[in-house]
């Protein structure tokens, strides 16, 4: 490991195009509309890709663990279950924060479009402590 670099968190690779095809039809329609909205707002391709990756991984979890319910039916407890799954699978604070941001922004969009009365992410606390592990390296007297 290079000096001063943090360990990367474990990626949860659950993306599967066949599973994406099985998403709740109502959810899939809203997800596609959200992607168009991000493009129209001229978010960077990297941001759109990152958000869509997070959302697809979350929705695969919903498909497999939460009966493929519509995102309109999910509540704070359902979202907390997903975040707990991510954390126990090894996601670090930075990755967890992005997941929170991706899902929260999606619900903010749904609220703006009057699809949901409130954003279930609003009362979920986000991780604040950065738990990335940095390996410290010390120079010997000969190296100084």
Regions found by a protein language model. Name each.
Residues 14-20, 31-135:
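N-terminal core-binding DNA-recognition domain of tyrosine recombinases/integrases
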Residues 140-144:
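Short, intrinsically disordered, charge-balanced linker/junction segments flanking boundaries
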């Amino acid at each position: 490991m290079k000096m001063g670099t943090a360990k990367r968190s474990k990626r949860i690779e659950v993306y599967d195009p066949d599973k994406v095809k099985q998403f709740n039809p109502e959810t899939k329609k809203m997800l596609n509309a959200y992607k168009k909205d991000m493009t129209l707002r001229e978010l960077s391709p990297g941001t759109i890709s990152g958000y869509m990756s997070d959302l697809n991984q979350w929705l695969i979890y919903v498909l497999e663990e939460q009966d493929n319910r519509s995102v309109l039916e999910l509540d704070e407890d359902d979202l907390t279950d997903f975040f707990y799954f991510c954390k126990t699978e090894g996601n670090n604070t930075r990755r967890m924060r992005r997941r929170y941001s991706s899902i929260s922004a999606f619900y903010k969009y749904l609220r703006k479009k009057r699809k949901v009365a409130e954003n279930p992410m609003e009362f979920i606390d986000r991780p604040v402590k950065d738990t990335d592990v940095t390996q410290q390296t010390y120079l010997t007297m000969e190296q100084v």
